[in-house]
A protein has these predicted regions:
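Flexible nucleotide-interacting loop at or near the entrance of a catalytic core
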Residues: 1-56
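Hydrophobic aliphatic residues
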Residues: 17, 68, 72, 88-91, ...
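Conserved post-Walker A coupling segment in P-loop NTPases
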Residues: 26, 39-106, 116-132, 197-202
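Short gly/ser/thr-rich secondary-structure transition/capping motifs
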Residues: 102-109, 145-150, 173
Length: 245
């Protein structure tokens, strides 16, 4: 457990705790679907309510979460991303809330959790639909009371960051199957962003192709442009992996 915790701590701190001002990313699209997304980001960024981002894998949920953070009043705070599916369920609670020295075997010193790292910033809970029911109840308590407890501590820690949750599943269906708490769903469902699949906004394909071409191979002069035949082939493809593919 000790080694697993250490590996998770090192890898996630390297990849997930982001200095937003230095983050280099772009959201590409001029389609009507993406124009609506941009408007949604603008409206959502004016407040600090909880946000739920829904969309298939590869549609850019993480980018949207970062954009909301960057345009919000807490943009100077940390942006922390937690992939629920990447952390073993038995370790997720200590990863989110942190723990005190001696809280369990292997806890040799206090560890700050992900909620605490996001102080005055934003935390993205990626793939919230995979969170256990037990942990869902504790997340609900954080949303209601604006505080949490490190494992092994009786002293509450204040929570003053924005929570953004993302999912590629239907939380409504999970609620009906008693696999997701309805009260937590209502808390998360305050503001929503629904991302379209790439097959539903193929008019953005030329923009995306040019963007990735310039980013990855254009600097070497390997590809100047795409032939019409190539564009037609891409347009006929349904891109099941979406923009990530």
């Amino acid at each position: 457990i000790k080694n697993t915790l250490k590996n998770i701590e090192i890898s996630q701190l390297k990849t997930d705790l982001i200095d937003s001002k230095k983050e280099d990313f772009q959201i590409i699209g001029k389609s009507s679907q993406m124009q609506k997304i941009f408007k949604d980001i603008g409206k959502i960024s004016t407040n600090d309510h909880t946000v739920l981002i829904r969309g298939e894998s590869g549609t850019g949920k993480e980018l949207i979460a970062k954009a909301i953070h960057l345009n919000s009043s807490n943009s100077n705070g940390n942006y922390v991303q937690v992939n629920i599916t990447a952390i073993p369920s038995e370790l997720l609670e200590s990863e989110l809330f942190g723990y005190e020295k001696g809280a369990f075997t292997g806890a040799e010193k206090r560890k700050i959790g992900r909620f605490e790292e996001a102080n005055n910033g934003t935390i993205l809970l990626d793939e919230i639909g995979d969170m256990s029911l037990d942990l869902q109840s504790k997340l609900l308590r954080v949303l209601e009371e604006k505080k949490f407890y490190r494992l092994g501590s009786q002293k509450p820690t204040s929570f003053n960051s924005r929570i953004i949750a993302s999912t590629n599943k239907s939380l409504e269906l999970l609620v009906k199957k008693n696999e997701f708490r309805d009260d937590l769903f209502f808390r998360l469902n305050t503001l929503t962003v629904d991302l379209p699949a790439l097959k539903d906004r193929k008019s953005d394909l030329p923009l995306l192709l040019n963007f990735f071409n310039e980013k990855y191979v254009g600097l070497n002069g390997q590809i100047k442009s795409f032939d019409e035949d190539v564009l037609n082939i891409f347009a006929k493809y349904d891109w099941p992996g979406n923009v990530r593919e």
